[in-house]
Amino acid sequence: MDCARLAPSAVNKQPWTFIVVQSDSQKQKLAKCYPAKWFTEAPVYIVVCVNTDIAWKRQFDNKNHADIDGAITTEHICLAAAEQGLGTCWVCNFDVAMCKENLDLESYIQPIAIIPIGYPISKEHQLSTRKEINEIVSYI
């Protein structure tokens, strides 16, 4: 979890908390938030949460950077796991209210991602289609 702890954040506010879900009873509760069969098979989950009250807010438009900071640390976790040969998936299409209730989270703590982690069942990895570099980069 050091990879997450050391991730950069706006003005170094570090507005994140992480819940490592390992127990079968808690995994069953978490699975109700995102009822996909493949999701229930992971041995461990990390729920990435942010505290919107302490996150930095841009003074020009008051934009809260909690989600951005949480996204940065989520990707740090995914990259570190891949380096160790582990598979991950960034899940953000889950029932947030149910997740908050099942994990007994305070009102100011928002779960933004659930990362199932485990060793891939298959060595074959199907790459998703990616845009060509000239479709996403412009030089001025």
What are the roles of these predicted feature ranges?
Residues 99-112:
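Short, electropositive alpha-helical surface patch
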Residues 21-28, 52-55, 96-97, 121:
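Short, charged/polar surface micro-motifs in flexible loops or helix N-caps
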Residues 114-140:
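C-terminal helix-cap and adjacent tail motif
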Residues 43-45, 88, 110-112:
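Structural motif
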Residues 4, 46, 61-102:
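Small-aliphatic-rich amphipathic alpha-helix that forms the alpha element of a beta-alpha
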Residues 17, 94-96, 113:
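Residue-level "edge-of-site" marker
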Residues 35-70:
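Helix-adjacent hinge/juxtasegments
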Residues 1-44, 50, 140:
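N-terminal amphipathic, basic helical "cap/leader" segment at the start of enzyme domains
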